[in-house]
Structures are given as C-alpha cells and as structure tokens.
C-alpha cells in the first residue's frame, strides 16, 4: 500500500477557508490582514 498525496487542491475550498472574505468576517482574521499589511505582503490572502 502506497502513501497517498495529501494535498488535493480545490479552488473553492481554498477561497472559502483562506480567502479575503473569510479573513474579514472575524476579528482575528482582520488582525491577520493587518499584520500582513504591516509586513508589506503583496498578497494578503488566498
């Protein structure tokens, strides 16, 4: 029995779990975005 690849990418799942709207929907999510802005990240969220 071989080990399966654990990363099975799905665009919808990625957006819904790690997307901008998801980040904005919670207080801590907004903190994440603020930190990433402060750090100067080009991409803030998925």
UniProtKB/Swiss-Prot annotation:
GO MF terms here are: structural constituent of ribosome
- UniProt keyword Ribonucleoprotein present: yes
**Gene Ontology BP terms:** translation
GO CC annotations, alphabetized: ribonucleoprotein complex; ribosome
Which Pfam family, just one, is annotated for this protein? Ribosomal_L34
Q: Which InterPro entries match?
A: Ribosomal_bL34, Ribosomal_bL34_CS
Keyword set for this entry? Ribonucleoprotein, Ribosomal protein
* HAMAP family recorded: Ribosomal_bL34
Report what the protein is called.
Large ribosomal subunit protein bL34
Q: Which gene encodes it?
A: rpmH
